[in-house]
Structure formats: C-alpha cells, structure tokens
Amino acid sequence: MADWLLYYTDPVYDAAFSLVTESPLLLSHDSDVRILFQLWLNLTVLGAILYLAGASVNFYFFFDQETLKHPKMLKNQVRREIYLSLESLPYTAIVTVPWFYFELKGYSKLYDTLDSWWEIPGAMLGFFLFTDCLVYWIHRGFHHPSVYWWLHKPHHTWKVCTPYSALAFHWLDGYGQSCPAHLYVYLFPMWKPLYMVSFVALQLWSISIHDGIYISNDEILLSCAHHTIHHLEFNYNFGQYTTLWDRIGGSYKKPVQEFANEMYFDKLKRKKEALLHGKVDGGDVGGKQKTGPIATTISAVAAEGMKARRGF
Ligand SMILES: [Zn+2]
Ligand SMILES: [Zn+2]
C-alpha cells in the first residue's frame, strides 16, 4: 500500500520540490528523506480527507441534527471535535510512518497478486477477528487510571457523540487503536487491495459507531447503540466490531435496559424531546425513578457511570 501512496503522488511532489530545491534528498524517489516526508504528508492529508469527507457525509445526510440540542452536547462540540482530530493527525501520522516505511522495504506480508478468490474471505475474517480482539484490550487498557486521564479522556469529553467524534482523540490514543490493523499484515499475508479497502472500512466503521444512528441492536455486532453506552458509562462496551470480547472480559452491556424491546437510546431521545417541551414528570435511570428536568436525569446517568468507574 505504501508503494501506491508514493507512486500516485510522486508527480505532485516532483513538481513542488523542483520549484524549491535541486537536492537529490528531496528529488530522488529512492531518498529515504523524501520517502519518509512524502509518506507522512500523504498520511496526514489523506487521513484528513477521509475523516472530513466520511464524517461530513454522515453528519449532513444521516445524523439527526436534533441531537445537537441534547443537554449533554457541549458548546461548539462539532468544531472542537474537528479541531482535535485535525490537530492530532500530523502526530499520529509521524508514528504511523514506520509501519508504511518497513512495508515498502518488504517486511510486511502484503502481496500484489491473488492466487485464489478464496484468499479474500479468509483474510477478511482473520483481519476482522485479530483487530477486534486487540482493539478491545488496547481500548480497555487505555481506561486504566495510570493512563486514562492524559491519554483517553480527551475522547470521553464527548458524552453525546457526532460523526466527528470518531477521530477526536489524543494522537497516541488514535495511533494505539490503529496499531492492530498495521500489525496484522506483518504477521499474516493479505492481498494489498483488500488491505486498503479494509483500512478505509475501519475508518468508516469508527465514524458509524459515533453517529447516533442506531441501525442495529444486534447481540453480536457492536453498533453505535453499544458505543453510546461506552461514552455515557465508561466501563462497558470497549469493543470495536463485535461484543465477543466484552462478553469474555465481563464488560458487555446490552443497549436494552429494563424494558423489554425498548432501547436505551430511545429513552434518552424521549427524554430529550420531553426537555424541549418543558419538564419530564418521571425518568427511569438505571431502574430508579427520578423526577426533575431531563438534564438532571441524564446527568444522573453519567454520574452513575463516573461512580462505577474503577479503571478496569
Ligand atoms: Zn473509551
Ligand atoms: Zn468513541
């Protein structure tokens, strides 16, 4: 994949560098300085384009704009999410470059030619299971009190998420959670185009679990409904694609609470609507009856999550 990143952008860099220098360090395609710089800038720019395009399409065409009036939505949250994401990207790209550089030098198991179409489902499944497991444990590790406050808390600033929350991380947090995807192709063979598609799909999935569109209340697939609980209550649903490791690790929480067939987010949505129309006369949070304005009851959800937080 690194060779494509360089090859298709070489003409742009050739033209730009030839305007300002004659040094082979920047003009030669074999120069490590040029390769490292080009990889870094490409990762930064393409990462930003993918993030802004994916999150913006979601935000303007699918995201419920009413969510912006939610009492737990922060002032200027969308702007702050975009700022943190774009601020982090260049740093994330710096530490990501070695993965691409050593891939270019032939250390990965990526390959160009497919021998059989059966290699696709096998590699997809392997990539999916491998990253699902490691992202779970890395994410859970980031909730350890020794690192949580400086590393992962920035992402938990957002109690109610928007599509732009997806990459709104500390740069090392975003990098840490992307490492399993990079590591996979150093351990297992994968067809290059499939890796590229999987990598983009991973980014889009990240956006989708923050977009407030609860398309699934599936028991196996980890959706936005589950990740919403993670942002509100901290100690549940650390997974990325499936609920498997949350179940094994004892951190699974179903989006269905006390009421059969009634989803947690639906309760929040109703309470939000009630707030917009005045006061609610009763709120059921965590099975306890509470009375008062919606802001109070939803704050109680977050407060209970805070009380319950014990790192692991
Ligand atoms: Zn988290
Ligand atoms: Zn999140």
PLM feature spans:
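Cytosolic/stromal cytosol-facing helical appendages immediately following the last transmembrane segment
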Residues: M1-F37, Y60-L74, P145-F312
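Membrane-water interface at transmembrane helix exits
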Residues: G54-F63, T96-L104, V135-H143, V185, ...
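Juxtamembrane helix-loop-helix connectors linking adjacent transmembrane helices
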Residues: H70, R79, I94-F130
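Alpha-helical transmembrane segments of multi-pass membrane proteins
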Residues: G47, Y51, M124-V135, A181, ...
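Core segments of transmembrane alpha-helices
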Residues: E87-T96, E103, L172-V185
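Hydrophobic alpha-helical transmembrane segments
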Residues: L36-T44, L86, P121-L125, Y175, ...
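Alpha-helical transmembrane segments in multi-pass membrane proteins
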Residues: H29-T92
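Function-critical hydrophobic alpha-helical transmembrane segments in multi-pass membrane proteins
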Residues: W117-H156, S165-A166, S178
